[in-house]
Amino acid sequence: MAKKATTDPLAPFSPEVRRWFEASFDGATPAQAEGWRAISEGSSTLICAPTGSGKTLASFLWGIDSLARRPDRPPGVKIVYVSPLKALSYDIERNLKAPLRGIGADISVALRTGDTPQSERAKMRRDPPDILITTPESLY
């Protein structure tokens, strides 16, 4: 049976994610709407859009929703975000806090860069986060 086409970019998301998004934003940006459509269809997706157009949320919300739907998921990293810049990594981590707090899901996030102390790296190995944000030089 074919999927029914919808113009609601939030249609594929869980009620919790929809409620959080609708309470937080006036609506999806074009980058988000097109990105979520492609991602929800299982397509590999590249989102090119200007600064401030919602790319971070476009790229993460589907993964956050998927993790939130599986509270019994096994431990381990499920999403890896490789940032070309350390400063951007910190921004990404900060920008994930609002949706994670608003949705209320138990999803852990860790940041690993060249500045991450060995003790924190060891903790990440023992208790891996659900989402790992890292830089190319730290991805090994």
Language-model-derived ranges and their functions:
Residues 1-4:
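Short Lys/Arg-rich cationic patches that frequently serve as NLS/NoLS or arginine-rich RNA/DNA-binding motifs
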Residues 6, 12-18, 24-140:
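Conserved P-loop/Walker A NTP-binding site and adjacent catalytic elements of P-loop NTPases
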